[in-house]
């Protein structure tokens, strides 16, 4: 991402929103129409498992990792710099600092993003678990 802070910021905001949308769809499937009512894999389950590995694991997770690396390289140092200067921080800058730079603010950009990544991962695991296909770490 280099100096493209705005692009990274926008990516994180959009990712959090789209991950939340996708998580709601997964949860709806989990609770309203189980993928494997008998707890055994079926053709739909195999298709969903394929989407999980060929789309989410192969494409989405690497992109999330790229965004995380960019945030670590760009925004974490900015947050540290802002932290050091809190005693002279203008009141007009504080809302931006709280929402966009603070890593420890669960209601801010980074906190919401991390919550959505976690919730989305757990929803995938729960859906696949209905069929005995929950992925396990190697």
Label the predicted regions:
Residues 3-138:
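A cross-kingdom marker for long, charged
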């Amino acid at each position: 991402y280099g100096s493209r802070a705005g692009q990274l910021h926008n990516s994180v905001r959009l990712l959090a929103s789209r991950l939340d949308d996708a998580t709601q769809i997964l949860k709806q499937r989990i609770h309203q129409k189980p993928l494997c009512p008998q707890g055994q894999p079926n053709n739909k389950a195999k298709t969903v498992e394929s989407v999980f590995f060929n789309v989410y694991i192969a494409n989405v997770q690497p992109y999330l990792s790229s965004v995380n690396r960019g945030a670590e390289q760009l925004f974490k140092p900015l947050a540290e710099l802002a932290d050091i200067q809190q005693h002279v921080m203008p009141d007009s800058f504080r809302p931006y600092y709280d929402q966009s730079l603070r890593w420890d603010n669960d209601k801010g950009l980074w906190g919401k993003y991390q919550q959505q990544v976690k919730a989305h991962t757990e929803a995938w695991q729960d859906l696949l678990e209905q069929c005995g296909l929950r992925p396990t770490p190697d």
